[in-house]
Regions:
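N-terminal type II signal-anchor transmembrane helix
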Residues: 2-42, 46
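Cleft-lining beta-strand/loop regions that shape enzyme active-site pockets
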Residues: 40, 47-167, 298-423, 468
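Charged, glycine-interspersed solvent-exposed loop segments at helix/strand-loop junctions
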Residues: 171-270, 421-506, 510, 516-521, ...
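Surface-exposed, non-catalytic interaction/assembly patches
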Residues: 173-184, 279-299, 414, 418, ...
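C-terminal long alpha-helix characteristic of the crotonase
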Residues: 226-227, 258-305, 475-481, 510-551
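Intrinsic disorder and flexible/low-complexity segments
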Residues: 301-306, 310-344, 466, 537-593
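Active-site proximal loops enriched in glycine and acidic residues that flank catalytic Cys/His/Asp
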Residues: 310-313, 352-354, 382-384, 404-406, ...
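Short glycine/threonine-rich loop-to-helix capping motif typified by GTGT followed
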Residues: 359-364, 502-505, 547-549
Length: 593
């Protein structure tokens, strides 16, 4: 018995000591992560900035210490960090050029165009840009086409096949589950409900998707033609041939690439360009290094601030606990009120990258934008898309900027309700009864997001009238903000999606250009020359992140890596449970291949 107690006591002490040791090691590791994230990067002479793309692109990214602690390699980049890093590389004399290494990046063409334009600006410094890949995906080739020299592996390939979209339809799946979908909408082109009630695109939806694709493809052709000096007709003919499976030598003959090299030869070439000896190592700086490089410009002392408020993701009245990358209506309204009352903030650039969401929430944000504009200029910069609710929250701004390939418009709303009467009674064996004092007292009775019975004719009429009123309000908001007649807005509304280039011609957008142009316009309208730029909402520090929703961030990043281009479709379905029934949402997933 005595020996047993000794053994038990020793085991308990061992477990406690092991726990203490692991806790100490965890704290040391965390402190190391924090220290490394805050340490200023020292740039060596003859350095090269390496744009090594692999992963996904967002407007902004939050540091994920849990992912770092677990040693995960999945990368997520913030567009804001990339654009700032390219600017720093241009201004830093020790950085001789940029090496684009485009493995894979899940990004829209609007974001790629912003990066591409930043690289064009970088080239004005006279520094070199070299691109090399084993296989160039089409989007990555579009980005890389700005390079002075495009190098491809002798066994490599270039994706060049045109633009396409492939929506997914769930009607048969919904039917097999025993669900009935009831739809209420305004607008011939408001086709967000189609995946649940059809098995193919309607003629109107096919029309708008085709025209948007052609507009985006036209921009891609024009940009690549300008950089590679290949006629657009020739580039289009190449796409018809589906160039992805050509021999590498053919890309040289077609002038899509400049030369063939293996990776070791590319490294030697980069050493020559940057002034390094063959036996030296490249002085390489990656995005995570450039974030901590000090800006090579004098610090502004004016006290003037231009706030850049990032509004990206679905517009949700009450985001669920597992929801991230969304616009929390209550939080954004509160933040805009704070910016309104901050006298140091002279102007606000509202960076919108949203397919829309709650119609009610969109109107609440619209109201705060109007109030903000009463005190200081508000300039909208549209990202990948600012459609439906995303356009709703933008339309009141002083000026609107969009990239040519931005997807915007979609002025319209819809409602969608799910009835599970067949699922509940025939499949699950559930029955429902009701007592009520008034005719429609049980309207909306449900289990979770699914109604226990479908709406009858009078209830459907009630819902449709509600949607009609919401659409009329949306049109009036746009007419007021854009200083156009309601008749003019109605001609370009009907839920139709437009590219930025098309929207400018229609008066829905003021100018084409990225966030830099929007910042310049904000400074001009505010009448200031010297200012600092501060991003909002403020990012969490690493300790707050670790104590907050890191499990959620980690799980979402893993799902994003696994699903790839289907992640947006997954998020749209997931957010159905968080959304109210009346939506101002883009009619399709803007995933252009």
């Amino acid at each position: 018995m005595k020996d047993f107690l000794k053994f038990t006591f020793a085991s308990v002490i061992g477990v406690i000591l092991a726990g203490v040791v692991f806790t100490i090691l965890g704290i040391i590791t965390l402190v190391g992560i924090v220290a490394s994230s805050d340490t200023e990067t020292v740039v060596k002479d003859n350095s090269i900035f390496v744009l090594d793309f692999k992963g996904s692109l967002s407007e902004r990214v939050q540091e994920n210490p849990l992912q770092q602690l677990l040693g995960e390699e999945f990368e997520a980049y913030g567009l804001d960090d990339i654009l700032a890093s390219i600017k720093k590389a241009k201004d830093n004399d020790k950085i001789k050029g940029i090496y684009i290494q485009p493995s894979y990046l899940e990004a829209s063409y609007a974001s790629l165009e912003e990066i591409r334009n930043a690289l064009l600006d970088f080239k004005e410094s006279g520094k070199f840009i070299v691109a090399y890949a084993d296989q160039y995906a089409q989007g990555m080739y579009y980005l890389s086409s700005v390079a002075d020299k495009i190098i491809i592996n002798p066994q490599g390939s270039i994706g060049w096949h045109g633009a396409g979209m492939q929506p997914v339809f769930f009607k048969n799946l919904v039917s097999k589950l025993g669900l009935e979908v009831q739809v209420f909408r305004v607008g011939t082109y408001k086709s967000a409900v189609e995946p649940f009630i059809a098995t193919e695109m309607s003629p109107a939806n096919r029309e708008q998707m085709t025209e948007c694709l052609e507009s985006v493809w036209h921009r891609i052709l024009a940009d690549v033609s300008d950089s590679r000096r290949i006629p657009t007709d020739t580039l289009n003919a190449y796409a018809d041939r589906y160039m992805d499976f050509c021999q590498a030598e053919e890309y040289i003959q077609c002038k899509l690439a400049d030369t063939l090299m293996y990776k070791d030869e590319v490294i030697s070439y980069l050493k020559q360009l940057s002034g390094r000896d063959e036996n030296d190592k490249l002085n390489s700086l990656f995005i995570e290094d450039m974030i901590n490089v000090k800006k090579d410009v004098p610090k502004d002392k004016s006290g003037n601030i231009i706030a850049v408020y990032y509004a990206y993701g679905e517009i949700l009245d009450a985001p669920g606990s597992s929801t991230e990358d969304c616009i929390d209506v209550q939080k954004m309204c509160k933040d805009l009120r704070k910016l309104r009352d901050n006298d140091d903030v002279k102007a606000v650039v509202l960076r919108v990258n949203s397919p829309g969401g709650s119609a009610y929430g969109s109107d609440q944000i619209w109201r705060e934008v109007v109030r903000l504009k009463e005190k200081k200029p508000v300039i909208v910069s549209m990202g990948d898309y600012a459609a439906s609710g995303g356009y709703y929250i933008s339309c009141a701004a002083n000026r609107i900027f969009a990239d040519p390939t931005t997807l915007t418009g979609s002025i319209g709303i819809f409602g969608m309700m799910y009835s599970g009467e067949k699922l509940f009674t025939e499949t699950l064996g559930l029955n429902f009864d009701v007592v009520k004092t008034n005719k429609m007292a049980d309207l909306g009775a449900s289990l979770g997001p699914v109604l226990t019975r479908p709406l009858n004719a009078s209830e459907q009429e009630l819902m449709q009238n509600y949607v009609n009123r919401g659409y009329k309000l949306f049109v009036n908001r746009c007419a007021e903000g854009r200083k156009m007649s309601t008749e003019a807005i109605e001609k370009v509304a009907e839920g139709r999606v437009w590219t930025g280039a098309m929207a400018k011609d229609l008066g829905l957008v003021d100018e084409l250009g990225g966030i830099d142009k929007a910042l310049n316009a904000a400074a001009t309208q505010a009448g200031i020359e010297n200012y600092s730029i501060i991003g909002y909402p403020e990012k969490e520090n690493i300790f707050a992140s670790l104590l907050g929703n890191q499990k959620k961030h980690y799980i979402n990043s893993e799902i994003k890596e696994y699903l790839g281009s289907y992640y947006n479709s997954f998020k749209a379905l997931e957010n159905i449970k968080d959304a109210n029934c009346i939506q101002a949402r883009m009619p399709f997933d803007p995933n252009i291949q």
